[in-house]
Design a protein with these regions (language model features):
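Conserved acidic residues
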Residues: 53, 103, 124
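Donor/substrate-binding cores of folate-linked one-carbon enzymes
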Residues: 41, 58, 108-221
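Residue-level detector of anion-binding/catalytic polar loops
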Residues: 74, 103, 152
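N-terminal glycine-rich "phosphate-gripper" loop used for MgATP/nucleotide binding
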Residues: 57-58, 81-82, 86-87, 100-116
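Short, surface-exposed acidic-centric catalytic microdomains
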Residues: 48-88
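Charged helix-capping and loop-helix junction motifs
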Residues: 88-94
Length: 230
């Protein structure tokens, strides 16, 4: 993917309409553990007044769809294998998402590289969570790569989605210590527990209007966040 130069005279700070419904669409590909964290936060009124109105998966039997169904949320299977190209799939996905008129799109283990058309359509109102301390270890296999590098700290990051893969402005990070006896599996579980705490907080901030995307980067309460977020 390529970087995009954002022009300050064409992109304004993006926040949800304070008078409109705070509607969330979640995209998943697998088990949906971060989705469950969001569902739990919603049930305790900790999503800034937000409501998850739909969960969409590119994998027909993703367990995340079952989680949505059990929570009374519309669950939509849109298998990517039924489309000839990435562009065709993303075009169909855009149509499904827009039927739900979301204020925010949340990627929760959605294992697809998004097309520029898709990203630009929802720029500034789409968040992702990544299992590393970005900008370190963009892409896949983050835990194995961290262990191979012998790092002593690891973690996860919430960021706005842009055309650069895992390269959008970082909002929030959680750091943890890597033990000498950690394996990929133990490190994954440690990071995942932090993800479940972090993601609902970022979603809440966005829907409360505190967290914004701008041409300069992510802003919190009107102040530009540092490169590594909060």
């Amino acid at each position: 993917m390529t970087n995009t130069d954002y022009q300050s005279d064409t992109i304004k700070d993006i926040t949800p309409d304070p008078l409109g419904a705070r509607r969330i669409v979640v995209l998943v590909s697998g088990s949906g553990s971060n989705l469950q964290a969001l569902i739990d936060a919603q049930s305790h009124d900790r999503l800034g007044g937000g409501e998850i109105v739909a969960v969409i998966s590119n994998v027909a039997d993703a367990y995340g769809l079952k989680r949505a169904h059990e929570a009374g949320i519309e669950a939509v299977a849109l298998p990517h294998r039924e489309y000839d190209s990435r562009e065709a799939y993303d075009g169909a996905l855009i149509k499904v998402i827009e039927r739900h008129e979301p204020d925010l799109i949340v990627l929760a283990g959605f294992m697809r590289i998004l097309t520029p058309r898709f990203v630009q359509r929802f720029l500034g109102r789409m968040l992702n969570i990544h299992p590393s301390l970005l900008p370190a270890y963009q892409g896949l296999n983050t835990h194995a790569r961290a262990l191979a590098a012998g790092v002593t700290s690891h973690g996860c990051s919430v960021h706005f989605v842009t055309e650069e893969l895992d390269g959008g402005p970082v909002v929030l990070q959680a750091e943890l210590q890597v033990s000498s006896d950690d394996t990929v599996e133990t490190l994954q579980e440690k990071v995942r527990s932090r993800e479940h705490l972090l993601y609902p907080i970022a979603v809440q901030w966005f829907l409360e209007g505190r967290l914004q995307f701008s041409a300069e980067g992510a802003k919190m309460d009107g102040h530009l966040l540092p490169e590594h977020g909060m």
